[in-house]
């Protein structure tokens, strides 16, 4: 890849990661103010919105990026500009349709989410209010997403990265300010506070749009300067243009829906299953912990690992297109190994430190520290599946087998749908986690088979090195538990968030150092990270 594209990819990855970190950090003060009940109410609205947003955008932002990049490379800037205008019109229409459907269907979704009746102080009307407040964001976010895709198609990653961060900052400032003022100053009540917390999605979107508008004005000259240099135009009709665009968009739609769909299934089945099993008293709080508070923690290593590993995908596409299958196998190996090298120790660490970690972030008694720690313990290993599914789908797209990525998702979602309710009745939150894990495992097995079949990929080296990673992670785990045991003589993480933070930081630092040192001494670090590793560390023995 060119240095410009590499730099742009880094900027975009950094922006995305900063946004996700901010999206996790704000939950600390938010959870203190609204507790588990408020978290559940927030998720009832937000999970509906997330699914409708994915449907409304239809994968267009990523598809427009690919479309614009293709026609720009041919010098056909006129077709790129034509797509921007047409795409914005489509996003406006689909956003409005999604808004009206969600707004008008809110009573139905509210009843389903609550399990058919009022639940622990929350009524159907409360959930309807929150869903309708967040639905307003559907009028703006699709258009903003498409403009980001247009900039990315011109290899201008800065506008997307900066607008993502600003959108998140504006959203969080409004969310926390509104929640605090309504609860502490105006005594407006939990429902109104959470409603305005979800409404922050619209305010944040306006912030992101302002940034994009500033960038547009700043770069309008260079974009318009391309027009006189345009080559032969494709003269595509709108029908052909959108047909091509949909062919790009379809995989992004389905793959992007993976986590939202699994969350959506939990949101709409968990309470009903728990009530039928006789666990209504805890169902709502458990759902908030499962789908909001714990999941944010689980997604930290997922974000880092996938962002690091997916930078190799463009080179995979290039190798496949040129027919260089030997290089293709090496690149798939490096992508998979990079992700597993980062995600396995992170998951082991979070699992072993689930108690201190949950207490550090959500120390309030209203958020059930013991219950949260147990859910985090069992949920964190699923992060490995999340990461592998993302890269699995990306590789299938890279070798031009998008349809198999879609099929793998459908297989997993069907398994989740079938198993979720019976497993929740049997095992409560752990059952929902198990259903998610089984769904992702099925998707991954299918995806791995398709990659082997169509890319000629051998898993021999990957399996061998994964076993070594597990051994290194086990050694790291022993070090973490020893540190935690020693610290236990001086402080208890159960005494408060500060004590929990001390345990997490010291144990994680020691564990990480042990893992990296062992990997370095075995030459494992050098094998996997290669040139990404600073020169000082590129010595040592070589792992097999």
UniProtKB/Swiss-Prot annotation:
Disruption phenotype: Cells lacking this gene are viable, have no defect in growth, but produce fewer spores, slightly longer cells and show an increase in cell chain formation. Also exhibits some resistance to moenomycin. Mutants lacking both murJ and amj have a lethal defect in cell wall synthesis. This is Lipid II flippase MurJ. Belongs to the polysaccharide synthase family. It is a multi-pass membrane protein. It is found in: Cell membrane. Pathway: Cell wall biogenesis; peptidoglycan biosynthesis. The chain crosses the membrane at residues 21-41, 49-69, 90-110, 127-147, 169-189, 191-211, 241-261, 297-317, 338-358, 375-395, 404-424, 431-451, 471-491, 500-520. Involved in peptidoglycan biosynthesis. Transports lipid-linked peptidoglycan precursors from the inner to the outer leaflet of the cytoplasmic membrane. Not essential for growth. The lineage of its organism: Bacteria, Bacillati, Bacillota, Bacilli, Bacillales. It comes from the Bacteria. It comes from Bacillus subtilis (strain 168). The keyword rRNA processing does not apply. Induction: Expressed at low levels during vegetative growth. Expression decreases significantly during sporulation. GO terms for biological process: cell division; cell wall organization; peptidoglycan biosynthetic process; regulation of cell shape. Keywords: Cell cycle, Cell division, Cell membrane, Cell shape, Cell wall biogenesis/degradation, Membrane, Peptidoglycan synthesis, Transmembrane, Transmembrane helix, Transport. GO terms for cellular component: plasma membrane. It holds the Pfam family Polysacc_synt.
């Amino acid at each position: 890849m060119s240095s410009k594209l590499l730099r742009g990819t880094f900027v975009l990855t950094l922006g995305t990661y900063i946004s996700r970190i901010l999206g996790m950090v704000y939950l600390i003060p938010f959870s203190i103010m609204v507790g588990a009940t408020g978290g559940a109410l927030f998720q009832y609205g937000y999970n509906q919105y997330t699914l409708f947003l994915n449907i409304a955008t239809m994968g267009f932002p990523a598809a427009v990026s690919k479309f614009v990049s293709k026609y720009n490379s041919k010098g056909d800037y006129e077709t790129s500009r034509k797509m921007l205008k047409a795409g914005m019109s489509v996003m406006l229409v689909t956003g409005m349709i999604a808004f009206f459907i969600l707004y008008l269907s809110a009573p139905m979704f509210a009843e389903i989410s609550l399990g058919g009746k009022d639940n622990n102080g929350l009524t159907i009307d409360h959930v309807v209010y929150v869903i309708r407040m967040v639905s307003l964001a559907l009028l703006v976010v699709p258009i903003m997403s498409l403009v980001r895709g247009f900039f990315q198609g011109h290899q201008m990653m800065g506008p997307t990265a900066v607008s993502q961060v600003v959108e998140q900052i504006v959203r969080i400032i409004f969310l926390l300010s509104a929640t605090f003022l309504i609860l502490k100053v105006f005594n407006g009540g939990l429902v109104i506070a959470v409603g305005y917390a979800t409404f922050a999605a619209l305010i944040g979107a306006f912030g992101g749009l302002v940034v994009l508008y500033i960038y547009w004005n700043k770069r309008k000259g260079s974009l318009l300067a391309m027009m006189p240099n345009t080559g032969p135009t494709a003269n595509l009709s709108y029908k052909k243009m959108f047909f091509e665009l949909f062919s790009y968009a379809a995989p992004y739609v389905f793959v992007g829906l993976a986590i939202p769909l699994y969350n959506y299934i939990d949101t709409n089945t968990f309470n009903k299953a728990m009530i039928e099993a006789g666990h209504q008293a805890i169902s709502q709080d458990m759902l908030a912990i499962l789908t909001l508070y714990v999941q944010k923690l689980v997604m930290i290593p997922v974000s880092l690992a996938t962002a690091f590993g997916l930078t190799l995908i463009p080179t995979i596409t290039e190798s496949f297109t040129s027919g260089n299958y030997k290089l293709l196998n090496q690149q798939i190996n490096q992508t998979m190994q990079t992700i597993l090298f980062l995600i396995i120790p992170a998951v082991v660490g979070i699992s072993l430190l689930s108690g201190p970690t949950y207490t550090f972030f959500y120390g309030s008694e209203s958020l059930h520290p013991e219950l949260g720690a147990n859910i985090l313990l069992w949920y964190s290993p699923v992060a490995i599946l999340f990461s592998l599914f993302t890269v699995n789908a990306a590789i299938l797209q890279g070798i031009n087998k998008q349809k198999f990525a879609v099929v793998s998702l459908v297989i997993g979602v069907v398994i989740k749908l079938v198993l979720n309710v019976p497993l929740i009745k049997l095992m409560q939150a752990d059952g929902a986690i198990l259903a998610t894990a089984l769904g992702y495992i099925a998707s991954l097995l299918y995806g791995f088979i398709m990659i082997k079949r169509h890319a000629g990929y051998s898993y021999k080296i990957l399996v061998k090195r994964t076993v070594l990673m597990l051994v290194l992670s086990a050694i790291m785990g022993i070090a973490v538990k020893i540190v935690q045991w020693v610290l236990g003589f001086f402080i208890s993480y159960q005494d408060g968030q500060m004590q929990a933070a001390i345990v997490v930081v010291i144990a994680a630092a020691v564990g990480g150092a042990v893992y990296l040192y062992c990997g370095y001494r075995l030459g494992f670090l050098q094998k996997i990270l290669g040139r990404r590793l600073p020169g000082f560390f590129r010595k040592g023995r070589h792992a097999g």
